[in-house]
Structure formats: structure tokens, C-alpha cells
Amino acid sequence: VLASPVVSDPLRQLDICATSDGAAALIVASKSFAEKHLGSLEGVPSVRAVSTVTPRYPQHLPELPDIATDSTAVVPGPDRVFKDQILDAAYAEAGIGPEDVSLAEVYDLSTALELQWYEDLGLCGEGEAAKLLRKGATSPGGRIPVNSSGGLASFGEAVPAQAIAQVCEVTWQL
């Protein structure tokens, strides 16, 4: 990794996941259909809830002379950025907080992005992600294993197949 070319300091080429081809599929069926066709539900994961959150953005459309103009200079951003909004809603809906999470599988397009998710998920304070990693807390067997699958570096970024692979990984881990 350290011998690979610098892409954007401090990230090097091998710190960033390569975009790749791939495919994934999930079969979603009712309990009765699965029992009828499989004979048993042993080893079959069940879904008890599904939720989505749509981030909120400013509702103002400024009249700007140049499309490349930074609209944040004219329109204030939302109080909470989209990841904060989504995480707040997910934790509230699940009735848990970051301290209750026992594993995580995050989108880690780069090594830096995985560290950012540690902070965004509330697994550590701002600026403490590297310390959490160095303590081994995010390793398999640690306090909060993160990306025990190996993350995107292990199977590539085949959008959206990698998201399904990560959902499968979390299901297997649970």
C-alpha cells in the first residue's frame, strides 16, 4: 500500500477500492412460501422490519448566474448532514444507541472513509477513529468488529452488488 502512487495525500492508490463488475441477488419470500419450497426454515434469515430515510435538504432554489457557483454561500445547509439524519432515524427507530451496536459493516471505498464511519456511527468521538482502530476495537474479536468481511477491498465496488454483499455479511455475522 505504501509503495503505491499517491492519489490525494495521504491516500494512495491501494487505499482506494477499485470499481469492479459484479452482480448479486436476494430472494425475498413469505414464510409460508419458503417453508413449502424449502421444507424447513433452518438457516433461513427472516426480516422483521425495513425502513428508509430520505435526507432533508434546503428548500430554497437560489437564482445563481453560474451553475458552478457554490450554493452554500447563498443557502445555509441543513442543521444535520444526511448521514447524521439517517443515523439518528435508524437509532431512534431501533430503540438503541451507538453503545448497543455489536458489529458494523460500512461502505469503505477508501481506508479513510471507514474511519469516518466510526465517528459518524458514534462508535468514538470526533477525531478518535484512528485510536479506536489501533486499540483493536474494530477487529474481529474486538469490542465492535467493523467490516469483518474485509470490506470493499476484499470484493470490489460493484455498485449496487456490494451493498447486497454487505447485507448478507451482516446477516451471517448475526
Set out the residue ranges of the language-model regions.
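Histidine- and/or cysteine-centered catalytic micro-motif in compact active-site loops
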Residues: 30-32, 50-52, 106-111, 118
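Stable alpha-helical structural segments in soluble proteins, enriched in small hydrophobic residues
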Residues: 25, 34, 82, 86-94, ...
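Short glycine/threonine-rich loop-to-helix capping motif typified by GTGT followed
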Residues: 57-64, 108-131, 158-161
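Condensing-enzyme catalytic core mediating Claisen C-C bond formation in acyl metabolism
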Residues: 6-85, 89, 137-149, 153
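Extended C-terminal subregions enriched in glycine
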Residues: 74-111, 152-158
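Active-site-proximal alpha-helical scaffold in enzymes
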Residues: 26-33, 155-174
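Short mixed-charge
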Residues: 128-140
